Amino acid sequence: DWVECFGKPIFQNIGYIHLVCSIERSKQIIEDICKIKNFDPTQIQTEEKLTIIWEPLPDICQADNLPVINELIQGFIGIKFIFSPNSEESSRLLGYEQEPSSLEECKIMTKKLYCNIKSTDHCVIRCGRLGSITYDYEAKKLLHMPAYHTFTPQKVVDPTGGGNSFLGGFAMGYILSHGDLKYASICGNVVSGCIIEQIGIPQWDATKKTWNGHTFKERFDYYISNYIKFEES
């Protein structure tokens, strides 16, 4: 379908794919993509050819499936993965009886989950009102970025779509910044904050280029000025 939509030459140059699907479906899609891009994902590559941003389906986030997820990620050593369940899904993957409710508990959980993926990959946990936590394998540290509406919770109307949109914004920031996890996490939280301000999709003004009355730059600048001091390692 992607080849028909974009054409093979363009698709072969696409380096980032966001997947929201099961383990089996993810494996099949990755294998199909690599055939089109003409490289073996089970072999180490001399240059980065494909990054998969994997948002697992909620129903596969069970402790019994963690070894299978681990096997899939570690089996495709020629691909970079950004694995991103939310905090509730992460807790089920690790066999917790309940979802962590504090930032410190989420940090501990993120480190534990990261231990189950190969060292060249990132683990991004979406923690709702607590923001996002990313394990940076290169710096060997956690990066916490607060939720966009930390100071304005009264503006949150409907959280539906916040997680999906976070990863869309994260992917955009990650690509534009050439892999800067801090920038990507900020973009993810900014976009997610916009999505949850109403029921349904945000109001788009094509003339002013605003979502719910604010441009992306205005939202980005607001986030930087209000939350950047909260970055924690």
Stretches with model-predicted labels:
Residues K8-F11, F76-I77, N116-I117:
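Alpha-helix termination/capping residues and helix-transition junctions
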Residues V3, K27-E31, N70, K217, ...:
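Generic detector of well-ordered alpha-helical segments enriched in charged/polar residues
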Residues I14-K111, L130-G131, Y137:
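Conserved beta-alpha-beta core of the PfkB/ribokinase-like small-molecule kinase fold
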Residues F6, E71-L72, I79-I82, D121, ...:
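Generic structural signal for short, flexible, solvent-exposed coil/loop and linker residues
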Residues F39-K49, Q62-N65, Y96-S233:
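Conserved phosphate-binding/catalytic region of the ribokinase-like
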Residues D1-G7:
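Eukaryotic helix-linker segments that join adjacent hydrophobic helices
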